[in-house]
Amino acid sequence: MGKPARKGCEWKRFLKNNWVLLSTVAAVVLGITTGVLVREHSNLSTLEKFYFAFPGEILMRMLKLIILPLIISSMITGVAALDSNVSGKIGLRAVVYYFCTTLIAVILGIVLVVSIKPGVTQKVGEIARTGSTPEVSTVDAMLDLIRNMFPENLVQACFQQYKTKREEVKPPSDPEMNMTEESFTAVMTTAISKNKTKEYKIVGMYSDGINVLGLIVFCLVFGLVIGKMGEKGQILVDFFNALSDATMKIVQIIMCYMPLGILFLIAGKIIEVEDWEIFRKLGLYMATVLTGLAIHSIVILPLIYFIVVRKNPFRFAMGMAQALLTALMISSSSATLPVTFRCAEENNQVDKRITRFVLPVGATINMDGTALYEAVAAVFIAQLNDLDLGIGQIITISITATSASIGAAGVPQAGLVTMVIVLSAVGLPAEDVTLIIAVDWLLDRFRTMVNVLGDAFGTGIVEKLSKKELEQMDVSSEVNIVNPFALESTILDNEDSDTKKSYVNGGFAVDKSDTISFTQTSQF
């Protein structure tokens, strides 16, 4: 009787801990089934399709609502909790990891697309174009990226990004003159010369969307400053720490609604698709991208994690399952950030000082899946146009795709803009980006999932590499001096050591019934 009862308790505990994940998986299956059935057996109007997807829209709005307070509070508390030298080392390790994995993803994508050659058997005229090509200048896009790092108005940066647009400067009109043969010739010569040397001016404007890059730069500096202010800055640290905890409580509430929202989100997207024939025409191209994403997420990232951390990477990935599934459904690294935090800290027990610093930066600049996709797409478009790319052009694609994906978050309409930048860098027709837009919505979901997985593995790797610095901070902290159990846990039995341990996962876990070990402190 004891074993069945124990198994029953284990099942109850499993369901209690994973009910959101299980219900989300069920919602995905049910959403796909509902979408296919509604599409086949009912003829919904455009307005009815919009109403049908309304619950999914509410989920997206709730997740986007929580992005801003989450990024601000987590970045400030994460940086303030670290010594400036330690935060510099952690930041450097994170950036090196992001750059290396992104470059590996680009190289993998190029190797696959050159080997499989998905565009050789097709021609440009065989594929229908969708959407329009944005007018992009590589230089202006890079300068806009730097401008957005330093917003002129912090409040405006919460909902708008700065962008520039080129406008042609019209020449002054010539005075009226008699159109003799000589004057006519002079006017035509002047007009031709003016067409050859057009003048442009830069016009600044704002587009809707959170300037995440600018906010991260500000929060990074702000966190460093209040961390150095000592007692004067402690009140601000406590405020943002409380804001971070309150935000995560709201995330838990949103997660309860997530299965219902995802059901209608995925069903509504299936109903919206009008031309499924395009998936057959671009099937080999899609298979190339998905193969690259699968290899990168199942082989390369886990291998890097195992080499550095020496732990089972797939167990770590399973702990991130809810975040990966959310990324797959909503197609946004930033909107998935609340769930990513929760999975990394609660399921995988990653130090909060690492997650609060590394994850917001990773969601902004670590785009492994996007970089791989852009590299494959650029070579695919070259193959469609019967263009043979040389070694120099392939290297250019690698460098441009890596750089463009890192700066994607600071560029308005990032997906199309960065794709056009990569195409323009090697002289490919930018308008051909419209050939692959029709399937981009589906591929975007998978590459977002890879981006989030890369961010998650990054926290585990950076935590391992920063273990010595974090332990030194623990030993030198005031709580460890006040609490003798923190330094003498070896003399306690397992039960007491778990109770008396002073610092666990970036937070202070103490026994409030013990007057010796209990100390009022803020948690980071």
Swiss-Prot record:
L-aspartate binds at S331, S333, T370, V411, R447, T448, N451. Keywords: Amino-acid transport, Cell membrane, Chloride, Disease variant, Endosome, Glycoprotein, Membrane, Metal-binding, Phosphoprotein, Potassium, Schizophrenia, Sodium, Symport, Synapse, Synaptosome, Transmembrane, Transmembrane helix, Transport. One of its GO terms (biological process) is glutamate receptor signaling pathway. Glycosylated. Its main location: membrane. Contains eight transmembrane regions plus two helical hairpins that dip into the membrane. These helical hairpin structures play an important role in the transport process. The first enters the membrane from the cytoplasmic side, the second one from the extracellular side. During the transport cycle, the regions involved in amino acid transport, and especially the helical hairpins, move vertically by about 15-18 Angstroms, alternating between exposure to the aqueous phase and reinsertion in the lipid bilayer. In contrast, the regions involved in trimerization do not move. This is Excitatory amino acid transporter 3.
